[in-house]
Amino acid sequence: MRILLTNDDGIHAPGMAVLERIARALSDDITIVAPNSERSGAGRSLTLTRPLRLRQLGEKRFAVAGTPTDAVMMALARVMKDAPPELILSGVNRGANLGEDVSYSGTVSAAMEGALAGIPSIALSQVYAREGAGLNVSFAAAEAWGAKVLRPLLDAPWAPRSLYNVNFPAREPEQVLGIRVVPQGLRDYGQTEILQRTDPRGFDYYWIKLAGMPSTPAHSTDLEAAADGWVTVTPLHCDMTNHAALAATTALYR
């Protein structure tokens, strides 16, 4: 099985090394095409105003000076054009991609690009505790549980334009409770702040401070399940149509 690996933390990120070890438990045919630097929060953005640079770093290892979506496009249209991947894995992200995170996440967006191309695609992220913030995030749960959560998905039928979002809890492997399939949760991002600072030359600059809190019923979504210590699996699809609203919206124009 040909597997493409990508991410949004950059090709040199620790999570990429973890993902490669997970993937090699499934196949020896691995190709890595990922951004050359961190592109967290890039969503599904494309690079359209400057050329993309592709650099080969080793056998089947390529860095793209672009976004995660750029990297997947480059892999499918150039690097792996003659032998397309049969599976795309994106991650392992340093930090959760839960609830509304998926809308901003370059990790999930890279998997979504694969899904749009008709290729089974899975995003993987490692949640970390607040005290674990920084560069020393433990990927132990992802490494121990990665292949376990992937194998059943590979044997299952895939709906068109669908993908899976997997999050590993901030627990030691032996403390993980198991695997739960849960829907996407909801955070209250109305609490987001814009922090103002002033540089030495007197010019203002700003930081986005994400301060949202979970606001979904307990134990029913990816947010609560991951916090409780479960590996979460959430099926996603690329069709963003609100099908429940179609009839009511149609009636507005009669």
Swiss-Prot record:
Annotated binding of a divalent metal cation, by residue: D8, D9, S40, N93
Comment on bound cofactor: Binds 1 divalent metal cation per subunit.
Source organism superkingdom: Bacteria
Listed name of the protein: 5'-nucleotidase SurE
Required cofactor(s): a divalent metal cation
Broad class of the protein's primary localization: cytoplasm
E.C. code: 3.1.3.5
Subcellular location: Cytoplasm
Catalytic activity of the protein: a ribonucleoside 5'-phosphate + H2O = a ribonucleoside + phosphate
Disulfide bridge map: none
Cellular component, GO, one term: cytoplasm
Enzymatic class: hydrolase
PANTHER family registered for this protein in UniProt: 5'-NUCLEOTIDASE SURE, 5'_3'-NUCLEOTIDASE SURE
Family the UniProt entry places it in: Belongs to the SurE nucleotidase family.
Stated role: Nucleotidase that shows phosphatase activity on nucleoside 5'-monophosphates.
One MF term in the entry's GO annotations: nucleotide binding
Pfam families, per database record: SurE (PF01975)
Organism of derivation: Rhizorhabdus wittichii (strain DSM 6014 / CCUG 31198 / JCM 15750 / NBRC 105917 / EY 4224 / RW1)
Keywords recorded for this protein, A-Z: Cytoplasm, Hydrolase, Metal-binding, Nucleotide-binding
